[in-house]
């Protein structure tokens, strides 16, 4: 078949064979074209037209293309879809090519190996992760090529759930797995990481990985990195380096200078349910940043600071010593408005140094990147000057470790023009007077253009053609253009170059000679300018370790100044962090909701947890009254305190927690085939297996997804287990509709009852959103149903049924354990008959109905209810 291919298509085939997993963007003139199966997939993902090459042939080749000047937007779309792209360029001038233009793949873009600023989200990391498993456990490593951040960990048996939690926290853009484990790992994690890339087992070999890591860090042992005795962590870390070197040939990774191995260190574990339920960095409903805790706290001014704050929110500390250091820095800047303001003003002049330096080291930076580096370095002395007067250890230490780097800023300013193009290959980069050879070539180029203008005047005079012009383009070079009306006056020695509709183009020997001289000088200018720029870029690359250290310090300064500002804006208090189990909050508020400017303002609430008498609070009250908000705000206040932030409260005393667990909300996990109740029980089981006396547990409506007595029994047993100091004894907030659970306070000394205050005025109910001591014996569900718009006939019937049920349940016995048991009166035949529609709903088998059938049935029932109401 290859013998039937044109030379161009043979060239395409050869290049495609080298990059079978990537979509090949093949440069043809002003377009990147895709062929065959790449064209079919590319057209579908990019939503562009699919056409064909050689339309007159029976076996047409599918074709689609995108313009080269707009390629970035198309790359972003494909990378978000989890695809990789091999970018193939024409690497020689088509005018000088003898035969087919030579083409090469100059860059392979994969979701996890991006370094270009226009392909990255500024405030978020872009991790490439690798994962491998063995009978004894699993290893995970992750690398942000755009910043040089490199981490690894190892887990023992039973790693699947913990690995899910970690991957959700890391959010890698691409996951590298061994080929023979790809099916298993894709099944487990593709819902978390859409781009799962299978790689050869050889790159996961621990011996090869060790050698590669020793070479990368120029050391004789990996003991200092903490992975020497962790073969799976080591294997995955080595696999990442191998993959980057394979996909980015010639790339120098000199900005990757450290591997951090995670163990059982002072970082709070946050499982995926807690990350989702507390909406730490994304809203649970739509995945957006707005409405998350991160969005409420983020006042950072640099991309580096935004990424660090995100890391702090997702990795609260359990050791209060470093937390108190952060907190003291926030307190100092909170109290000193002037210094905080000046630091923030100076930080505005700092670019993303981490990613700038990565592009410089990887030889992907342009001249504008170097100028941005220069401007950032020039802002550093003022920042350091403001730090000099700081007394908190967190800020003082950064002042003492400061690097100046003024000499690099001077070198860049002395070399580069103040206004440079985006391309580094087209000239216009280097200042006049910097290089004598370049200055000489520029004189030739400028004089040459004057000579061409003189030839234009000369030829007009000789021919008498006033409209004669000498022009230039990249295909034909310099040429004389004469309109059709003047062709009879063209001299015989003019050589025709091109015929247009209204004009013809010519050249002369004199013009050709001058063109060679001028264009030769311009080509040498471009070459020399790039060489001088590249030399400057290499000099800048040698400063990478110092700039990276500065970037980390600047990010930390940015975060604490931002936290000080948000504390000042919202009247936060400095929490008292302790090592005991107290959790006392006075006038606590929800950090996200209070910024939403709620009608009537946000109602603050108190929390008293801890000690032998307040281990578990049973919180009852109606829906929509604020129970869930109260639970979430308590967890968020604790988390904020353990990242070093001030908190939304009047007073807060917080005994540091080792974990925060949340069981909030109800939703089916359709991807894993789990019902609402199964999800609820799985999350509850995770809490009971892993919570300790130092944990904070937030439970909202345990047991809703099953029958009343089953649900009550489970909720009762779970509450007892959590409250019992001999079993778990975790500090727990337990919101429930099961009012029977308030009886736990009579039989368990560590349980206390609280409820959401309600004011009744006739049939009107006012939710006060205030948590007060004592249990509630009413849920006000019918009132909520009325607010939701249920038909009047249904509301009336519900009130009738409720009255009869309450009458039948009035006499109750209590068993020896304090559990309330209903008398037979509650189950006798005096109960009212159910509504016919309820009978119909019970008999419906939803699993045998299509979504359309279910919607039609629901519509029919609604219409019947409306007819009853109107009747």
Label every PLM stretch briefly.
Residues 201-212, 216-219, 268-274, 280, ...:
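Amphipathic heptad-repeat alpha-helical coiled-coil/stalk segments that mediate oligomerization
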Residues 88, 111-120, 251, 388-394, ...:
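Active-site phosphate-binding and catalytic loops of NTP-dependent enzymes
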Residues 323-326, 346, 350, 444-448, ...:
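Intracellular alpha-helical coupling/juxtamembrane segments of multi-pass membrane proteins
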Residues 834-871:
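C-terminal tails and terminal domains of large nucleic-acid-associated
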Residues 2, 10-14, 21, 537, ...:
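Conserved phosphate-binding elements of NTP-dependent enzyme cores
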Residues 1-332, 341, 345-361, 365-457, ...:
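Charged catalytic and DNA/RNA-contacting regions of genome-maintenance
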Residues 36-37, 230, 301, 306-312, ...:
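ATPase nucleotide-binding head domains, primarily ABC-like/P-loop NTPase cores
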Residues 167, 172-178, 186, 510-543, ...:
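Conserved catalytic alpha/beta cores of large enzymes that bind or transform nucleotide phosphates
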